[in-house]
Every structure is written in C-alpha cells, then in structure tokens.
C-alpha cells in the first residue's frame, strides 16, 4: 500500500486547504469518517482555484501527508512516557504512510498491533466482540476517555425476535 502516493509530491497549497477543515481544530477525543472526509469533500477542495491542476499522484501524496501530519500532531502531544504506538485497520497496509509517520515521530516506536499478536485487520471486530460480551454479561463499559461520556454504561441492547 501507498505505492501510488509515493510517486507524487505533497502540494503545500492543497495540504493547507485540506487542513482548513474545522475537524482538525477540535480537541480530542474525536472521531470521524466518510461522513465528513469523502470524495465530495475532496472534489470541493480541488475545485478551489488555489489548488487546481494537481496530478492524481500529487493528490494522493498530499492526502497521505495530511493523514501523517494530523496523526503526528496528536502523537507528539502525548505524554513523554508514551513510547510505542500500535496501529491497526486498513491504514496499516500503507507502508508509505507508516514510514512518514515514523519519520515525523522519531521518539515513538510505530508498529502494528501484529506486535501484540492481534491482526491489524481484526482489531475492530475483536473490540466489538468484547463490547458484545460486556453487554451480554450486563457489564457497564467506561468509555469516558474516548467519548467524553460522564459515566459507564451498558452499550448496545439485546432484542429477541
């Protein structure tokens, strides 16, 4: 992964336009996905006169740099005792991105969850399985650090057909 992006060059004007999205100014914890960052969003940014006529390779390189910069900013804000970062999900297949992230965060060890014996592609499924187990056991889960919830709660529900 990342071969296409690795053939392009990051375009600073485009990168600045991408970083102007209000999401990046939000304080953690935060989460997002395709509801905000999608082809329609990218097309709107690319239609801006400041960033017209960028090659597809350069768009890919710039998007990769955006991912790297935004992750690195959060990692560099962590306490100094955090030395290892475990990556999971589809992005772990992007060797170009992981190499950029490691270069941007030289004081952190950037590895996949494979180092813990957990396939990076399976971590989300494993997490949801654990959440389901907690629900079946009627055990509340405290996700305050991730969601800003003020108390632990039973997540999900069981509905018999």
Positions of PLM-derived features:
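Conserved ATP-utilizing enzyme core subdomain
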Residues: 1-68, 72, 151-161
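Catalytic phosphate/nucleotide-handling subdomain of diverse soluble enzymes
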Residues: 69-153
